From Swiss-Prot:
Its EC number is 4.1.1.65. Keywords: Cell membrane, Decarboxylase, Lipid biosynthesis, Lipid metabolism, Lyase, Membrane, Phospholipid biosynthesis, Phospholipid metabolism, Pyruvate, Zymogen. Catalyzes the formation of phosphatidylethanolamine (PtdEtn) from phosphatidylserine (PtdSer). This is Phosphatidylserine decarboxylase proenzyme. One of its GO terms (molecular function) is phosphatidylserine decarboxylase activity. Pathway: Phospholipid metabolism; phosphatidylethanolamine biosynthesis; phosphatidylethanolamine from CDP-diacylglycerol: step 2/2. It is an enzyme of class 4 (lyase). Belongs to the phosphatidylserine decarboxylase family. PSD-A subfamily. It comes from Aromatoleum aromaticum (strain DSM 19018 / LMG 30748 / EbN1). The modification Pyruvic acid (Ser) is found at residue 184. The keyword Lipid metabolism applies. Heterodimer of a large membrane-associated beta subunit and a small pyruvoyl-containing alpha subunit.
Amino acid sequence: MSNNYPHPLLAREGWPFIAIALAVALVINGAAGFGWALPFWLLFIFVVQFFRDPPRPIPQGAKDVLSPADGRIVAIEPVRDPYLDRDSVKISVFMNVFNVHSNRSPVDGEVVARWYNAGRFVNAALDKASVENERNALHLRTRDGHDVTCVQVAGLIARRILCYVEAGASLARGQRYGFIRFGSRVDVYLPAGSRARVTIGDKVSASSTILAELP
């Protein structure tokens, strides 16, 4: 296992929110005392924990598909991949507001294509979120020629999908490529014949949990 890239322990996406929460807590603490400022210190602590982005051990098995997000497994099913029009195995991870919201590549590979779809903002724990909600999809191709589709899905509260790569980019497994704020979902479509290594309800960690094994 290895950690293949450096990054701050607090996600850059959260720095403005952390700074504002800290400033408000300090101002109220100075003006009115700790008692009045306590709710704002608690808010500051919540914001810090929300935007935490810890390094993770990264399994290096050639056929391993890693979880792209922290959260809970809400779907494992054979479906038609709507992006590549093929039979596939779909595994979905639901992220609540207490999970780390950094998204990381499930495999080593090249970004073949990227698609953005505008949509609704229904509860991301529901299956219909995969086809109705705002979403951003990446088509990744591994060195062995396997195609993996990784889809960031906005949720009821999360209405900001951030993706930092385009077609032609190379991603290492576990590499950070995006972020979704305040609860959301990530769907992974794998080649037919892939074997799931998780079950419904399992808690998973981005980069360190093995979701499945490629054929």
